[in-house]
């Protein structure tokens, strides 16, 4: 019988967690890819129309997100031209730290009414399709 104590794993040897993560994984349409310029510099943002519910009649939830992480930013910048050309860009994504933010409609039929936007951080684009054709991120080109 072996009575030696188990070696601590690498994860157990790390510092204790000081932050709790809230992640959302899904599939949706990439829209409004843009660089936002503010006094302290700039950042990249986009919106994602996430699909959920029945495959036959999916519902949509909209997220307005700041793009975090070098790989996610590189992939979104690559997809930007397709979004701007009004092609259908579908992405498998991961969001973090979502929260609601209220706003007032400035124009249109809802002018003056309060709306709610779901904000967050885009952490990852796992895969993408443009007009149904897979994107090869390894080569940063459209797959044939």
What are these regions (language model features)?
Residues 2-144:
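Single-stranded nucleic acid-binding surfaces, predominantly the OB-fold ssDNA-binding core
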């Amino acid at each position: 019988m072996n009575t030696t104590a188990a070696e601590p794993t690498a994860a157990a040897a790390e510092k204790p967690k000081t932050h709790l993560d809230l992640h959302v994984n899904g599939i949706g349409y990439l829209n409004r890819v843009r660089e936002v310029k503010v006094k302290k510099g700039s950042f990249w943002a986009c919106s994602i129309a996430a699909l959920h519910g029945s495959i036959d009649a999916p519902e949509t939830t909209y997220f307005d997100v700041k793009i975090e992480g070098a790989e996610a930013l590189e992939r979104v910048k690559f997809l930007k031209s397709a979004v701007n050309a009004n092609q259908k860009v579908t992405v498998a994504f991961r969001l973090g730290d979502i929260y609601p933010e209220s706003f007032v409609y400035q124009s249109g039929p809802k002018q003056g009414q309060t709306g709610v936007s779901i904000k967050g951080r885009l952490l990852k684009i796992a895969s993408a399709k443009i007009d149904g054709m897979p994107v090869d991120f390894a080569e940063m080109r459209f797959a044939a």
